[in-house]
Amino acid sequence: MAASLRRPSFTTCSSPTDTDDEGVRGTCEDASICKRFAVSIGYWQDPYIQHLVRLSKERKAPEINRGYFARVHGVSQLTKAFLRKTECNCQILNLGAGMDTTFWMLKDEDLLPRKYFEIDFPMIVTRKLHSIKLKPLLSKPILDLHSEDTLQMDGHMLDSTRYAIIGADLRDIADLEEKLKKCNMSTQLPTLLIAECVLVYMTPEQSANLLKWAANSFEAAMFINYEQVNMGDRFGQIMIENLRRRQCDLAGVETCKSLESQRERLLSSGWESASAIDMMEVYSRLPRAEVIRIEALEFLDEMELLEQLMQHYCLCWATKGGSELGLKEITY
């Protein structure tokens, strides 16, 4: 239905899938709260997250905050490298976007792609749409960039000229593709797909289907994946057990055995080049001035704990086509 963003028509309903995936949806809440806390004590600037996520009363551990800083920095650097290579003549698909604020941050830096898509569970999308409707700081950029009188919107979807948010299950490729095409996704534009702690909650077959669809659907594309790695050791097993206690199963953990298994899953899904580094490597490559700044924010008692945590998460990226754009040259 067509509706004004200022007076949108919202409907709320839950499907059996929403209920079954409650544990996975809970990880969205956890990650959002951790990011909000890190922003609140100065790790990085984000004026938008406060309008989407509540501030936790519970202080987060320094190693968690530094881990999120490295995650945000790493994904941001690769994203901006893609935008520079394509001169923003591209589109971005943020898979499992949650309460992510990248669209608004990129607009502030004059780095918006031709269109930015977010996809997540319908219940998460409904919640985010509610915040967008209520907060002018979030809605105004969407309206300012919109070229028509009305926006396409319902409780699980918003489609505007430069931004779309879609409620969909990433395990249902046919439904996902149909909804994206309704929102004018182009298979001709260079496309960046981003997944942060998303594939690990899918079975290996389900994530392979998504990766193959992404590799086969676009003439030139890049995929950024942030998730667990080295999960076969004792530390990894403790992480798995902790999540299971919260009714959250890492269905795809077998592809998180090593950096090599992460690269291989991308190459075997049709991507032409693939790289993977653990987050300790990302942290070690941070600009020295930034490291000094963030390490002054909080005292970290045991560096070993940070290293253990960072060695169990990784940043992976893969490219397909786009040789004339130099996509293969993108690295962290």
Swiss-Prot record:
GO biological process: methylation; negative regulation of protein-containing complex assembly; regulation of apoptotic process; regulation of glucose metabolic process; regulation of mitotic cell cycle spindle assembly checkpoint
Gene3D superfamilies: Vaccinia Virus protein VP39
Reaction(s) the record says it catalyses: [phosphatase 2A protein]-C-terminal L-leucine + S-adenosyl-L-methionine = [phosphatase 2A protein]-C-terminal L-leucine methyl ester + S-adenosyl-L-homocysteine
GO CC field: cytosol
InterPro entries cross-referenced by the UniProt entry: LCMT1, Ppm1/Ppm2/Tcmp, SAM-dependent_MTases_sf
GO molecular function: protein C-terminal leucine carboxyl O-methyltransferase activity
Keyword Plastid annotated: no
EC number: 2.1.1.233
Keyword S-adenosyl-L-methionine: yes
Keywords from the UniProt entry: Methyltransferase, S-adenosyl-L-methionine, Transferase
Binding locations of S-adenosyl-L-methionine: R71, G96, D120, D169, L170, E196
Enzyme class: transferase
Location of region: Disordered: 1-23
Protein family per UniProt: Belongs to the methyltransferase superfamily. LCMT family.
Classification via PANTHER family: LEUCINE CARBOXYL METHYLTRANSFERASE, LEUCINE CARBOXYL METHYLTRANSFERASE 1
Function (record text): Methylates the carboxyl group of the C-terminal leucine residue of protein phosphatase 2A catalytic subunits to form alpha-leucine ester residues.
Protein name per its UniProtKB record: Leucine carboxyl methyltransferase 1
Source organism: Bos taurus
Lineage: Eukaryota, Metazoa, Chordata, Craniata, Vertebrata
